[in-house]
C-alpha cells in the first residue's frame, strides 16, 4: 500500500508539472513546442497506474480539472488545424494519416463496432454527440464498419460543424449531417436513434457527466444503446471519468466496459442499453 501511495504521489507531481508547463504556454494552437509537450503528456498516461482520481485531495482535483480544460482547448485547436489542412486538399481521405494518433482512431472505431456487433444488429441511425471539427469517430464508423447507417453529428459549436461537414467522401457525407445544438436541448430527437455515442469531452466534470447521462436516459428509446467515452488510470488526468453508478442511475444496463491496454492511447468506453422502466 505504501509503495502504491508513493507511485500515486509521484504521478500527481508529474502531472502537476505538466499543468504548470502547459499553463505557461502563450498559445495552445499546434506548434513544435505545444506538440512536444502534449506528446510527452500523452505518453505519461499510457502505462498502467493504480491511481483513482476520485480519491485525490482537493488541490490535486483542482489541478486535474484545469488540466482537462486545457487539454480540451488544445484538442479542439488541433482538430481545427488538421480539419482545415485536410479540406484544403483535393482528396482529404487520402491524407488522414497525417493526423497524430490516426491509428488509434482506427483501432478505437473497430473496437467499438465489434462490441456493438456483439449486442445488436447494425443500427439504422446513430447520433454522435460532441463530434467536433474533425469527426474521425463517426467518419471511420460510417466509412469502414457501418456503410448503411445514418450518423447524425451534434456539436454546440457551429464553426466546428462548418469544418466537419467538409471532411470525408461525398457518399459518406450524405449519411453524416451535422447539427448545432447543446446536448441538454436534445429531447424528442434522441428517441429516433438506435445508438448514441457520447464524446469524452461532453461534460467536463463528474456532475456534468452524470446530468448528461440522466438526460440521455430520459429521452433515448427503450432498448437503444449508449456508448460513453470515459477514462481510466492516469488517462483520467486528461479526460473526465464516467462512473458506472451514473450509468445505472441514468436508466441504463452496462453491457461492456473497455479500458485501453498496452500502448493504446485512446479513451476507455462503456457500452450500455436503455432499460425499459
Label each region the model flagged:
Residues 39-121:
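Conserved Class I S-adenosyl-L-methionine-dependent methyltransferase catalytic core
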Residues 223-233:
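Conserved beta-strand signature within the Rossmann-like core of class I S-adenosyl-L-methionine
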Residues 163-192:
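S-adenosyl-L-methionine
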Residues 256-277:
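Core SAM-dependent methyltransferase catalytic element
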Residues 183-184, 192-209:
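A short SAM/SAH-binding and catalytic strip from SAM-dependent methyltransferases
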Residues 133-148:
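Conserved SAM-binding loop of SAM-dependent methyltransferases across substrates and taxa
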Amino acid at each position: 500500500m505504501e509503495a502504491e501511495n508513493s507511485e500515486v504521489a509521484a504521478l500527481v507531481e508529474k502531472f502537476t508539472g505538466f499543468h504548470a508547463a502547459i499553463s505557461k504556454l502563450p498559445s495552445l494552437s499546434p506548434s513544435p513546442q505545444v506538440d512536444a509537450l502534449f506528446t510527452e503528456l500523452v505518453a505519461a498516461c499510457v502505462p498502467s497506474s493504480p491511481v483513482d482520481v476520485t480519491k485525490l485531495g482537493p488541490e490535486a482535483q483542482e489541478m486535474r480539472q484545469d488540466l482537462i480544460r486545457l487539454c480540451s482547448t488544445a484538442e479542439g485547436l488541433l482538430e481545427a488545424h488538421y480539419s482545415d489542412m485536410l479540406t484544403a486538399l483535393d482528396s482529404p481521405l487520402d491524407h488522414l494519416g497525417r493526423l497524430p494518433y490516426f491509428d488509434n482512431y482506427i483501432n478505437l472505431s473497430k473496437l467499438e463496432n465489434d462490441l456493438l456487433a456483439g449486442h445488436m444488429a447494425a443500427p439504422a441511425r446513430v447520433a454522435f454527440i460532441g463530434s467536433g471539427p474533425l469527426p474521425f469517430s463517426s467518419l471511420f464508423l460510417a466509412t469502414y464498419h457501418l456503410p448503411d447507417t445514418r450518423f447524425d453529428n451534434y456539436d454546440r459549436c457551429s464553426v466546428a460543424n462548418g469544418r466537419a461537414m467538409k471532411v470525408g467522401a461525398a457518399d459518406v457525407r450524405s449519411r453524416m449531417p451535422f447539427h448545432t445544438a447543446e446536448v441538454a436541448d436534445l429531447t424528442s430527437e434522441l428517441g429516433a436513434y438506435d445508438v448514441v455515442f457520447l464524446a469524452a469531452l461532453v461534460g467536463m466534470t463528474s456532475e456534468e457527466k452524470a446530468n448528461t447521462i440522466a438526460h440521455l436516459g430520459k429521452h433515448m428509446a427503450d432498448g437503444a444503446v449508449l456508448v460513453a467515452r470515459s477514462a481510466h488510470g492516469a488517462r483520467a488526468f486528461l479526460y473526465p471519468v464516467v462512473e458506472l453508478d451514473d450509468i445505472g442511475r441514468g436508466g441504463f444496463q452496462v453491457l461492456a466496459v473497455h479500458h485501453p491496454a498496452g500502448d493504446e492511447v485512446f479513451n476507455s468506453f462503456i457500452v450500455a442499453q436503455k432499460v425499459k422502466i
